[in-house]
Design a protein with these regions (language model features):
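N-terminal Rossmann NAD(P)H-binding glycine-rich loop of SDR-like oxidoreductase domains
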Residues: 6-17
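Rossmann-fold NAD(P) dinucleotide-binding segment
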Residues: 43, 53-76, 82-90
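Alpha-helix C-terminal capping/helix-to-coil transition sites in glycosyltransferase folds
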Residues: 45-46, 50, 94
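Rossmann-fold NAD(P)-binding glycine/threonine-rich loop
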Residues: 64, 77-97, 105-117
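Hydrophobic beta-strand scaffold residues
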Residues: 28, 73-74, 97-99
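Extreme N-terminal starter segment of soluble prokaryotic enzymes
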Residues: 1-4
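NAD(P)-binding Rossmann-fold cofactor-contacting core
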Residues: 19-40
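Conserved anion/nucleotide-ligand pocket segment
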Residues: 109-113, 117-131
Length: 132
């Protein structure tokens, strides 16, 4: 499987990059890094999937890139507007698209813990603040 990562310089992008190195059948063929100024110019081959850990500002480019290359798009970014979500849904008619925000291990473990203890804390007023 040929993978392209957008947001490879962020925390999750770096983790995924290191994980990919441990598999013989998954190849990182390039990255899309908006800050580099070379957005998508160094891709070596045809991607099977683009995995996005960047930010909402890149969604138009990512949809265009994935559609043009007829590859799947896994979006792991939060904060999309209703208009962005409509674009993502429309892209799903042409290519496989999965919008799965907060894919980090920590968030998923946290969600599991919250589910298991929420009944015990039903009388508590709890606030959760997300910080990057």
């Amino acid at each position: 499987m040929n993978v392209v990562i957008c947001g490879i310089n962020g925390a999750m992008g770096r983790v995924l990059h290191e994980e990919i190195k441990t598999y013989d059948n998954i190849n990182l063929i390039g990255s899309l890094s908006p800050r580099s100024g070379r957005f998508g110019q160094d891709i070596d081959g045809m991607p099977d999937v683009v995995i996005d850990f960047s930010n909402t500002a890149n969604i138009d480019f990512l949809i265009e890139y994935a559609t043009k290359n007829k590859c799947a798009l896994l979006i792991c970014t939060t904060g999309f507007s209703d208009e962005d979500k409509a674009k993502i849904k429309e892209a799903g008619k042409a290519i496989p698209v999965l919008l799965s925000s907060n894919t980090s291990l920590g968030i998923n473990v946290f969600r599991k813990i919250l589910k298991s203890i929420s009944a015990e804390l039903s009388t508590f007023d709890i606030n959760i603040v997300e910080k990057h």
